[in-house]
Amino acid sequence: MLALIESALGIEEARSIAQARGVFRLAFGSGDYRRDTGTSMDDLAMAYPRSRLVVASRIGNLPGPIDGPTVGSSHPILREQSEMAVALGLTGKLCLDIEQLPVINEAISPTKSDVTWARDFLADFEARGRVIRDGSDLPRLGRAQKIDRLATAFGITPI
């Protein structure tokens, strides 16, 4: 089940929802949440509920949550909101119009330079026998693997 979280209570219960049997992903019903709470669409105002969903998803061992849709046809606003969602740890965005897809896909895709870094890191890691050298290798390995998976999914090649 894709659990659509649309209220203050839903945000506060996101952890238990993420751990519920059958739930495979959380999504943010941002418009209904704003109506429920009186919150503006401002990035700062929306950071808390988005972050709660990211943390709840992690605790529930789910993929990163899906952000709510952007209303309107302004691609700069859509791009900005998509980039903010990604910066907070969300991994997708609901769409209201098929014309939003290319903008969202570009915003959530890794850059070519990120892909180059990731593949170089992974190649070096393999070349040294998959040995973890220090405490920073594990987080970098996880980041590199995530970037590589996304690059493969989006068909992005390194520089």
Where are these regions (language model features)?
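Expand to "…catalyze enediolate/carbanion chemistry for C-C bond making/breaking, isomerization
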Residues: 1-159
